[in-house]
């Protein structure tokens, strides 16, 4: 909301969370009014300095409201060098709360990159067509891109939730290892008693025989 009147309207509507835009980040009256609902607050940091974020966070926490801080840069569209994913973990560590990204890049890559770092919230602008007229069309993704973004974020979340044990995977892949690994093989039939030299052998699939790392046990 951008005014106390808007806050009162949204209270009557029954919203379950509040977004404080960076332009309202120092608006104590709005913060006080929304605090009466005890709903979660999403604080955008698009135009705020660290000192200003400190003050906003303190005020919101003083009101006892659940808080998620959104890394954001108020440039439309935001170029990649200004997106600031480095701030995700910085904000999380500094304020010890949930952190998300409010993205104005107009690209789905940004949200995927943020998801790979680990975020609780991803906010994007969406347009029905990039040919439409409007102040944030250039900062928006299409409906089709939104679908891909959601699928990608869920895929990445699944990756991050499951750590891999390399030894366990190697054991699981034993049948494949036998197919793709190689064994020590003689290049030609050898007579009994022949002294085997390096030039007499090669490595070939499958890996069901003497392992290449055991080559020295065969030579001589």
Task: Give residue spans per PLM region.
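Catalytic cores and adjacent flexible loops of soluble metabolic enzymes
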Residues: 1-220
